[in-house]
């Protein structure tokens, strides 16, 4: 759950809302006013960022690995090729940041010559992600780990039925003997040290709990342990782009202080670029709409990229972190 402090602070700094509460104004009207104020604040920040720090990405250049998601990436040939292999280049294309996480993860594996039938991989917080079936067709073996069926709020993403019947969820044929699904805590990986060539996780570690993202850090320490020397960790997580704090999502400070700077043998393969392009800033969408994405009319999804999200006054998107074990 996103931090409620931003909501409380917004109320306390808006006398009109406080007055409405004191006079017992209709709660739905109060919520509506609050949302308008929070939306205004978020869009003011976007306007400031676009004017003060304009940034455009060249879709024809070789993509960097460690960075924020950009709308322009869907025009990059390398990324489009991977999306095509994942059968995600629909016509017209529907743009979703989850596609980007998977494509960038595969791109990193290719760059480091790990996408082959000699490499073993582990997915932490795997759920029932479609990328698992793609990787099972390209790697020696993939282990998908998650708390399947244990947490009600994640039952749709990590159903207990995936444990025994992953084939039911496969979008295309895959090597069934190359995928093993295990119920396992991402902060306590039940494997010997130096077992895997690849460890990957897509928008999961931020949900592992603990103060100062302790759960995410413990998961990364376990990844550090089970990776072989020169193995790679491909991690997508959520990053706040404005000056806000949250107990789950990282921001531009805590992604270093609570994660990157605390690791020992895992090192970023290149500097992290936390700039966001102007075109990506234009895609901002409220989180309630995004949460209902699968039920939204196709025509809306075709014209509204799901990349940058707003929850209250918090603006966040996906960030890719690629590490190598030294």
Residue ranges of model-derived segments:
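A short glycine-rich, Lys/Arg-flanked "PGG" loop and its adjoining helix->strand segment in the class I
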Residues: 214-229
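Conserved beta-strand signature within the Rossmann-like core of class I S-adenosyl-L-methionine
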Residues: 230-238
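Class I SAM-dependent methyltransferase SAM/SAH-binding core
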Residues: 122, 129-188
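Conserved Class I S-adenosyl-L-methionine
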Residues: 244-279
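Conserved class I S-adenosyl-L-methionine
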Residues: 115-127
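Class I SAM-dependent methyltransferase Rossmann-like catalytic core
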Residues: 57-116
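A short acidic, Gly/Pro-enriched loop at the edge of an enzyme's catalytic core
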Residues: 184-199
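Membrane-proximal basic amphipathic "stem/tether" segments
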Residues: 1-56, 291-299, 314
């Amino acid at each position: 759950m996103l931090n409620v402090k931003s909501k409380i602070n917004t109320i306390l700094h808006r006398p009109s809302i406080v007055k409405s509460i004191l006079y017992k104004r209709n709660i739905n009207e109060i919520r509506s006013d609050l949302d308008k104020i929070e939306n205004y604040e978020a869009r003011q920040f976007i306007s400031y960022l676009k004017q003060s720090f304009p940034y455009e990405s060249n879709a024809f250049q070789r993509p960097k690995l460690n960075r924020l998601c950009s709308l322009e990436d869907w025009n990059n040939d390398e990324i489009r090729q991977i999306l095509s292999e994942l059968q995600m280049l629909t016509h017209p294309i529907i743009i979703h940041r989850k596609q980007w996480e998977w494509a960038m993860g595969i791109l990193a594996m290719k760059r480091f010559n790990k996408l082959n039938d000699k490499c073993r991989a582990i997915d932490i917080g795997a759920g029932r992600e479609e990328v698992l079936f793609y990787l099972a067709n390209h790697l020696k073996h993939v282990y998908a780990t998650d708390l399947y069926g244990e947490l009600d709020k994640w039952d749709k993403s990590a159903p207990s039925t995936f444990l025994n019947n992953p084939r039911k969820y496969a979008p295309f044929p895959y090597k069934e003997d190359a995928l093993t699904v295990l119920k396992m805590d991402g902060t306590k990986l039940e494997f010997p040290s130096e077992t895997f060539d690849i460890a990957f996780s897509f928008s999961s570690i931020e949900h592992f709990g603990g103060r100062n993202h302790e759960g995410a850090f413990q998961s990364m320490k376990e990844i550090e342990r089970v990776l072989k020397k020169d193995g790679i960790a491909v991690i997508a997580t959520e990053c706040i782009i404005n000056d806000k704090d949250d107990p789950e999502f990282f921001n531009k400070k805590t992604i270093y202080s609570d994660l990157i700077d605390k690791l020992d043998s895992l090192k970023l393969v290149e500097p992290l670029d936390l700039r966001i392009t102007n075109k990506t800033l234009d895609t901002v969408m409220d989180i309630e709409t995004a949460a209902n994405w699968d039920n939204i009319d196709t025509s809306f999804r075709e014209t509204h990229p799901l990349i940058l999200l707003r929850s209250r006054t918090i603006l966040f998107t996906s960030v890719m972190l690629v590490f190598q074990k030294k």
